[in-house]
Amino acid sequence: MIYIGIDPGKKGAMAVIDSETIDLPVVIKFSPEAYRSILLHARGMKCTLGKEVKCCLEHVGAMPGQGVTSMFHFGENFGYIRGLLEAFEIPYELVRPQKWKKEFSITGGKNSSIEVCKRLFPGVDLRRSERCRKDDDGLAESLLMAEYARRRL
């Protein structure tokens, strides 16, 4: 079984957990090409190896203070991701942040997600690049959504 978690935001990410290697999840930052290749690979594993694939896509709406242009780009990313999931016939569920965060008892901000993620997946590097010093909440949250899919979907 393959579980995918996707944070569709500007600094979003995608995480993939294979039930055979739960301790070695794959986490990638947002890039249309990377998302396409990962989902195509997941579809290939589904078709050739008969692995079942489940995806948790974060369902978020407009946030107060966001401009029209940023909301348009967010909607564009969200639509692109949904289009890929549909085209590659990967079943997905739209899950609101409150729902998946409740699963992990996350009540605080972005740092809470990073802390929980590090506790569940201590070996995963949550930095966006080698040069970054701080862990990235988008990477952490996508991995937590993949874990949510593993537990609940």
Residue ranges, per PLM feature:
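Phosphate- and other anionic-substrate recognition elements at nucleic-acid/protein interfaces
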Residues: 1-153
